[in-house]
């Protein structure tokens, strides 16, 4: 089954909502995350798990490939291009490959806020 596209503004709003619901429900409300794992997490933990997944779209793997650039070798191997990160309009739900316009620094730039939030969360 193919997943639908990943849009940063919608995902960001979902993350914020999960954190607010956790503020209200605390550890009394837990859901399975990831689905099918049998692992129960509170909503704050789920928000951070989803946030880390969104951040990974931009991180290089062991071969230097970033999911946001798909299979384009230019961005993985060329020394002049490998550190260029494009902020696509939306992303493929299964692969993380960037789709649509690649100059969406506005809403896709929310990844910077996610990185800051995750760094703070990890240091607690």
PLM ranges: what are they?
Residues 1-124:
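Acidic, mature catalytic/reactive cores of soluble proteins
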